[in-house]
């Protein structure tokens, strides 16, 4: 299986092919995640791999509905403020991440792409706030960029009302939940199942099935999100959840729901822009 993070992206296209896509008024999906520890059973590229899978499937759905779409090479030098106490969690300063991301988006804009959508499945709030602030700033300067995320994320970040460049995606917790017996938010049942479905060769299945669920409570989250040694003390093996609860059938349903929800929001955004 091809495990390249450049699979299906512009990195595999020639420049005339990219120019042709621009002439076809193609939309651009920009995968934005990180390289981060995901316990002893998952690879550090988990967020990037899964974001890439989602982007390719969204692209395919959009193209089936007649909307030309390309995927930009992934941006994976972001912020890991919770897992920064672990080896393998690359984290850069907010200013560095913003500067690099701005210039990447400015490149796409200058070439003539009229719709640029950021897609990220990295749940670090400092990372997500950096994305939102970057997109809002660029959008204020007429950049055709937008950031899609679960609507609950924008609510927790305090964006109300939402600017047009922040696109909320409605995902029901009941629909996308796999593990319900414990807090499962990092390298647990959800991500382990998803990686087992899409990149089984990158999952240490024997290790995953031997791991015990973490016992964090809501009152522990305040300490956990501080990162560094505080987070590592609570989750010394680098996961928060139940990795042994691998459910391939359920994660397929979750993936389909995520693809549908994101695709629908992009199409609505494109139709709104066309009508303006």
Question: Each predicted region: which residue ranges?
Answer:
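Extended, histidine- and acidic-residue-enriched regions that form the cofactor-binding/catalytic faces
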Residues: 1-95, 99-115, 121-276
């Amino acid at each position: 299986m091809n495990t390249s993070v450049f699979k299906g992206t512009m990195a595999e296209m020639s420049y005339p092919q990219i120019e042709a896509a621009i002439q076809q008024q193609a939309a651009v999906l920009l995968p934005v995640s990180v390289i981060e520890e995901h316990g002893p059973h998952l690879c550090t590229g988990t967020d990037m791999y899964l974001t890439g899978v989602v982007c390719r499937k969204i692209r395919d759905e959009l193209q089936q509905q007649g909307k030309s779409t390309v995927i930009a090479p992934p941006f994976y030098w972001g912020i890991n403020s919770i897992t920064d106490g672990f080896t393998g969690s690359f984290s850069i300063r907010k200013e560095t991440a913003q500067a690099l991301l701005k210039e990447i988006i400015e490149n796409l804009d200058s070439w003539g792409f009229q719709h640029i959508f950021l897609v990220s499945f990295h749940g670090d709030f400092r990372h997500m706030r950096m994305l939102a602030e970057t997109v809002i700033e660029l959008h204020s300067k007429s950049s055709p960029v937008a950031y899609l995320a679960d609507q609950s994320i924008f609510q927790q970040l305090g964006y109300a009302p939402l600017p047009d460049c922040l696109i909320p995606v409605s995902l029901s917790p009941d629909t996308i939940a796999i593990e319900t017996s414990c807090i499962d938010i990092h390298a647990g049942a959800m991500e382990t199942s998803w990686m087992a479905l899409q990149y089984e060769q990158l999952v240490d299945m024997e290790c995953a099935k031997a791991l015990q669920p973490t016992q964090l409570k809501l009152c522990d989250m305040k300490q956990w999100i501080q990162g560094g040694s505080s987070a590592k003390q609570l989750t010394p093996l680098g996961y928060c959840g139940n990795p042994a609860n691998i459910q391939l059938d359920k994660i397929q349903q979750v993936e389909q729901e995520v693809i549908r929800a994101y695709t629908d929001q992009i199409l609505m955004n494109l139709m709104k822009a066309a009508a303006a």
